[in-house]
Amino acid sequence: MLLCVSANHKKTSFTVLEQLARVSPDFASELVEAEDIDGAAILSTCNRFEVYIDAIQKGDQDDVCKTGLLVQNRIGELCNISPSTIIEQTSFLAGCEVSRHLFSVATGLESMIIGETEIAGQVKRALTYAQKCRTTSPELERLFQRASAVNRHIRQSTKINEVGQSLVSLSLDLASSRIGDWSGVRAIIVGTGKYASKALALLKERGVVDISVYSPSGHVNNICNTEGVRNIFNLQTALSGCDLVVGCSSVDKPVITKQDIETAQASGSRTSRVRPVGRPSTDLTAIEASNRSRHVLIDLGLPRNFDPAISDLPTADLIDLDMLRVHAPFDNLAAEKMAHELAIESSSQFVNDCKQHEATPVIVSFRNYLESLTQTSLRRTDNCKHAQHALKHFVNSLIHIPLTRCKQLAANGESHKFAESMEILFDVKTDCTEGTQYQSSCGKSFD
């Protein structure tokens, strides 16, 4: 049975999300060592932490809830979060509700900014990492692969792409009220990943030409080799000569503290291109004279890249995920509604496909049984081509109605009835168990 423990910006505080971001990706490997779990994959973003599980269904609904509770408690232990807090601030989904949720997530319908596109790549990478660590299962792979396909279908069929902008884009929009002329801004990007690349592209679109990149881990990749971009190795020194810092790195602790900013501003010698919020743009000359050094810091990291105490400084403006959640724009309701309907429809189709997939052992056993009868009969007729063709045509005609009925039963979660009939009538045994993983928990979420 597919299960999901979800912590996200809708229900979980960013303080808890920050703690969850420190959970090692190897947690999935720990989960699959349990005898009742076949597979696990972790989706972790700046405003979401979700664990997807393929669990062996042994009992009733209470056993399903017990598995979810055990996973929630273990997550709490890893992050030093109390059981009551982790249960209160996470959701537990089971059965068909899992596919409906992931399809909505992959399409950006559950994002802080409706329709944003970064999440689709993050869903793909979550599956890739699980495959690399050998923690996935066939059922989980089908789920994640279908989620990517549904994302493409919904974006092609609706105007959801026109609704969503990225967190990076929104953060730069908010920063615009503090910046007079983007072309003169001196920017530093902390990090070298996907968000850093997005930040680099958007800064260039706005006319920023003075861009540096700092990697806390010392990792060098394509963004560090981009034309016109400088690599810096001493962040403290670079801070004194910059206006804007964008944090997009995965770090365990802040790379810039309040004291770092105070030191940088005390030693800064260049006029800042940043103005205090509320000052009219016509007053730039006075601002430059009175604010020799001022910073805007955009923190997109989880855990935080920058010390939240920086916001206490009168000469620094900190834009973080809490602020972005408040300023996230209203969505296009028509496009969102249509996208949600398609996600629900796709989830129903996925569940139906999975139910029919569960009937595969029954169908294969029945086909093998009839094939053996066919071969036995052919040996008695000198195996001539005419007889072979006629007999196979007869078998295919004979099997059509039973297999159609089997698929209908499977769609209702009753493929075991066909399996039982096969065993009674023909002594054909299969591994098909009673019911399906989607029957008892369909439509259930446990908050």
Swiss-Prot record:
Q: What else is known?
A: During catalysis, the active site Cys acts as a nucleophile attacking the alpha-carbonyl group of tRNA-bound glutamate with the formation of a thioester intermediate between enzyme and glutamate, and the concomitant release of tRNA(Glu). The thioester intermediate is finally reduced by direct hydride transfer from NADPH, to form the product GSA.
Q: Which family does it belong to?
A: Belongs to the glutamyl-tRNA reductase family.
Its EC number(s): 1.2.1.70
**What Gene3D superfamilies has UniProt attached to this entry?**
Glutamyl-tRNA reductase, N-terminal domain, NAD(P)-binding Rossmann-like Domain
Pathway where it operates: Porphyrin-containing compound metabolism; protoporphyrin-IX biosynthesis; 5-aminolevulinate from L-glutamyl-tRNA(Glu): step 1/2
Q: Which gene encodes it?
A: hemA
What note about domains is in the entry? Answer: Possesses an unusual extended V-shaped dimeric structure with each monomer consisting of three distinct domains arranged along a curved 'spinal' alpha-helix. The N-terminal catalytic domain specifically recognizes the glutamate moiety of the substrate. The second domain is the NADPH-binding domain, and the third C-terminal domain is responsible for dimerization.
* Any GO BP: protoporphyrinogen IX biosynthetic process from glutamate
**Originating species:** Tropheryma whipplei (strain Twist)
Q: Key word Oxidoreductase present in the record?
A: yes
State any single GO MF term: NADP binding
Keywords assigned: NADP, Oxidoreductase, Porphyrin biosynthesis
InterPro entries given in the database record: 4pyrrol_synth_GluRdtase, 4pyrrol_synth_GluRdtase_dimer, 4pyrrol_synth_GluRdtase_N, GluRdtase_CS, GluRdtase_dimer_dom_sf, GluRdtase_N_sf, NAD(P)-bd_dom_sf, Shikm_DH/Glu-tRNA_Rdtase
The source's domain of life comes to Bacteria
One Pfam family in the UniProt entry: GlutR_N
Instruction: Tell me the protein's name.
Output: Glutamyl-tRNA reductase
